[in-house]
Swiss-Prot record:
Domain HTH HARE-type, chain residue ranges per copy: 14-81
Keyword Transcription: yes
Pfam families: HARE-HTH
Record-level GO BP terms: DNA-templated transcription; regulation of DNA-templated transcription
Name of the protein in question: Probable DNA-directed RNA polymerase subunit delta
Provenance organism: Bacillus anthracis
Length: 175
């Protein structure tokens, strides 16, 4: 779009987003955000102060508008230029190849699982003792429940005694 054909009044009515869309369409290549801002300022005749006042809203509008895409490294382009599959490839950062480390001998022999064969016959008496110990623990926990029941009964008895005391106290006050 040739902006020279528009009068200054018509250019002032154009939004920054419309100008960027036209600029990118004419260039046909991705451009950095700073270059886009400079071109907008030049086309619309904005001072540096005006640009600074509008730059935050412009960046927000650029992100929200679906016609534009951020290609990383602060480069912007038109979404219509990139098929969906290519967008993913451009946006994703390229992984850096990792340096290979020298394998050092740690002083231990490598353990191979295939050498060991475990059967049910390998079960030791220690495992049977563990089961018996677990049974004892469970029995002890049942005993703890009995202690809680005793506490509940004690609380009930205390509450009844307190009620009886309150009644006798009130009778004495009435006299």
């Amino acid at each position: 779009m040739d902006f020279k054909q528009y009068s200054p009044e018509e250019l002032k009515e154009c939004s920054m987003i419309e100008v960027v869309h036209s600029v990118l369409g004419d260039k046909r290549q991705a451009t950095t955000f700073n270059e886009l801002v400079q071109e907008i300022a030049q086309v619309l005749g904005l001072s540096q102060e005006q640009v600074n006042a509008k730059i935050a809203q412009f960046y927000t509008d650029l992100n929200i508008d679906g016609r534009f895409i951020n290609l990383g490294e602060n480069r912007w382009g038109l979404r219509s230029w990139y098929p969906y599959e290519q967008i993913d490839e451009e946006i994703l950062p390229q992984p850096k190849p990792k340096k290979k480390r020298k394998v050092e001998d740690d002083g231990f022999d490598d353990y191979i699982e295939e050498d060991e064969d475990f059967d049910d016959a390998d079960v030791t008496e220690d495992e049977d003792d563990d089961v018996e110990d677990l049974d004892k623990v469970l029995e002890d926990e049942d005993g703890d429940d009995d202690d809680l029941d005793d506490l509940d009964e004690d609380e009930d008895d205390f509450a009844e005694e307190e009620l009886e005391y309150d009644e006798t106290e009130e009778e004495e006050e009435e006299l």
